[in-house]
Design a protein with these regions (language model features):
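Active-site proximal loop and beta-alpha junction motif in alpha/beta enzyme cores
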Residues: 1-59, 68-127
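An anionic, turn-rich surface loop/hairpin at beta-sheet edges
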Residues: 62-63
Length: 127
C-alpha cells in the first residue's frame, strides 16, 4: 500500500488502517499489509502489519519481496539492488524478470538468532 510520509505517520492511525485491510472480507484468511514509500532512487521505506501478530513487525521478507516486485513491475524501481529500510534494518532485493514474469527473487540482509530450542524424536512423531 503506497503511503506518503510513512516514517512520520501516526502509529495508531496506521495500525487501524492495517487492521481494516488485514480483515477485509475479500481476504477470508486475512492478509499481511505492507505500507511503503519511495524514499530515493531504488530505495523504499516499508512497514508491515502482520496477521497473527496483529501489529507491526520489524521486518517481513515475503512482504518485502512482494513490495519490490510490484514496484518493479510498475516501473517505480529498477528491480536491481533495491534497498528496503524497515524498523528491523535493511534488505537488498533483486528481482529476476523474464518479460513480465518473476523468475527469481533474491533478498540479502543481516540475520539474528532470536531463539534456540530442541525438537525431540517424540515431538517429530506428532507431525
Amino acid at each position: 500500500v503506497p503511503y506518503p510520509n510513512l516514517a512520520q505517520a501516526d502509529e495508531n492511525a496506521l495500525r487501524e488502517l492495517g487492521r481494516k485491510i488485514r480483515f477485509y472480507p475479500e481476504f477470508p484468511k486475512g492478509a499481511n499489509v505492507n505500507f511503503c514509500e519511495l524514499t530515493g532512487e531504488d530505495e523504499v521505506f516499508e512497514r508491515t502489519f502482520e496477521r497473527g501478530v496483529e501489529d507491526f513487525t520489524y521486518a517481513c521478507g515475503t512482504g518485502t519481496g512482494c513490495v519490490v516486485t510490484a514496484l518493479t513491475l510498475m516501473g517505480k524501481v529498477s528491480g536491481r539492488q533495491v534497498r528496503v529500510n524497515m524498523t528491523g534494518g535493511q534488505l537488498i532485493v533483486d528481482v529476476d524478470l523474464q518479460g513480465n514474469a518473476v523468475q527469481n527473487l533474491y533478498l540479502t540482509g543481516p540475520t539474528n538468532i532470536v531463539c534456540k530450542g530442541e525438537v525431540t524424536d517424540e515431538e517429530l512423531s506428532l507431525i
